[in-house]
Amino acid sequence: MDEQVIFTSNTAGTVATLHSLEQSSLRQCQTESKFSSCVVKQKYLFVAQSRKALIQVYDLHGSNKRESVEQRLPVPEVLQALECVDEDGLLLGATDSGKLYIWQLASGNLLNVKPMAHYQGIVKIKSICHGKYIVTAGSDSRLIFWQTMDLVQKDEPKPLFIIHDHSLPVTDFIFSNTLGHSLDGKLYTVSKDMSLRCYQVSVDHEPTCIATFTFPSSLNCVSLDTADRAIYVGTDTGVIQIPLYYKVSNSKIINLLQPNESKIYSITEITPGAMEPDLSSREKLFSIGQILCARIVHNNTTSVATSLDGSLLVSGDSTGKCTVTEIFSNQPLKEIRALSTNDSTGPVSNLIVFPVTQQSESLLDVTKIVKPWKFPNLQRAIVDRKHGINDVYVQFHENSVHNVLPVSDFDSYLDTVASEEHIFHQTGSINSTVNRVGQTKASMTATAKESKVSSDDDIYKSKDKQIAQLNGTVASLTDAYKELRKMHEDLMKEHQQLLSKNGTQTEN
């Protein structure tokens, strides 16, 4: 299993892999706003174009993948944030004026429009809890929780929670990996006010701020370790690692996110090349609210993400390249640049890292070319809810598992495996023969038929023997049962006689 790295900039889009050298370029991909792209059904990439009311669709996987644009979807106005809810088949788009659009992907219907979801432009949209809730962050320094059903069904949906602790625009946020079907976990937000805030989120009460981290510069992005052990914050000077389990002394490790009390910590960066302070000075600094943190990347970071196992950090900078860094050693492993003739393609605006599973079709007898799926055009007018029923377009693919040899014809599969084993079997110490399976296909078929007939005769003979054995067993069991029944009746008679004798003696 490999991991795919997708990043875009002002004039280029690139698709690369984390553990190999494979790389391709997305043609005609131009987007300047952050979080303006999303992956749909782990196969397609939606990119909202800058200064154009248009969404471009790219096919990332399968036999139909290519670098050119697969489909263009016009939208009512220019979008600067996108999010897809795969569980519900919804596409959400946001504008610079704070308007929120909700489309149904299978039909293209515009389900609802929230004109003033935020007072200013929406920066990021995130679907959580398997599509139950939608979280939006805006330049108005607010972060709002919505229920997905309210956004779809109600004309005037009301927010579930509103967080407005930041004093400047929110630039990014991320939820803890422990967040599952229910709304119960931690939320991390970063802002231009040079602060990182951690909230305890629950559906039963308002989000509670449990920790605040202050920095010497504004914050651009945030990512979280896969095991919730550390936070990676991207700033104008690089990426800073904040360990959530902070070592104060040899025998003392403190959890910085205590749910019972809200604390404010000041981040003090460890200077590269300088000696790390001893534990006594660390304890003194911690007592006055200062935390020593290391800087992993030293470039102006605009986007950051972690690998699946949490060992690698992918950071996009202002020059348009992505750097893969090993977190443990703080050593850069490789740099990924856009395939462009320009020296710089602009800052990295979108960065997506997700695992990719390659599907092999080597066992298929016949490989059919499937036409690429086309998404319906996104409507500009809100659908009338009074009808209640709308057309949904779905493409059903033929199940290719039935074409695989073990499932389609198991006997032929066994014969094929036996012939392959015979081909590679060494009959002597020196001589060996190699044959082609395709040349012996006819002989294998005839041999398979003969072996099938002989095997059927053997099966019938063995069944007759088993039936005779079972009949003999039943007869012997019947005789034994009769003998036991006779013995039981004799014993009962003797018992009755003894009882009668004892009764006569007691009467006398």
Swiss-Prot record:
WD repeats lie at residues 74-113, 117-156, 214-255, 289-326. Gene3D superfamilies: YVTN repeat-like/Quinoprotein amine dehydrogenase. Keywords: Nucleus, Repeat, Ribosome biogenesis, rRNA processing, WD repeat. It comes from the Eukaryota. It is found in: Nucleus. One of its GO terms (biological process) is DNA-templated DNA replication. One of its GO terms (cellular component) is rixosome complex. Transmembrane segments: none annotated. Its main location: nucleus. The keyword Nucleus applies. Belongs to the WD repeat IPI3/WDR18 family. Component of the RIX1 complex, composed of IPI1, RIX1/IPI2 and IPI3 in a 1:2:2 stoichiometry. The complex interacts (via RIX1) with MDN1 (via its hexameric AAA ATPase ring) and the pre-60S ribosome particles. Component of the RIX1 complex required for processing of ITS2 sequences from 35S pre-rRNA. This is Pre-rRNA-processing protein IPI3. It comes from Kluyveromyces lactis (strain ATCC 8585 / CBS 2359 / DSM 70799 / NBRC 1267 / NRRL Y-1140 / WM37) (Yeast).
